[in-house]
């Protein structure tokens, strides 16, 4: 069911992303927007401390983070995570994607993309450039 108050639903799938998750989530909460957005987190039974980090951010930002934390890995059972768990929860007019081991560096990312889509109704999607880095932050080729 759509909700007029939420314009963007951010879909974030997590599996053993503990080393990267805080940076990912900080990229969400630093967003400067003139609209409401939600972050739909799905943890697929991580064996590290990903679930603890998800709960921490959900407690701190309950109006933004909407988690599902699985007890059994769904992907290994052949379950389509987006189709089964993520897309049915979407309330926004627009959907953004960011995996738990990725992160956003631009605090205006969502605002810029929504402005672009709202300005020209012939656009059905937009994306931004990426910078590939290793876990220590060193830029990789590409």
Regions found by a protein language model. Name each.
Residues 1-142:
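Nucleotide-sugar donor-binding/catalytic module of glycosyltransferases
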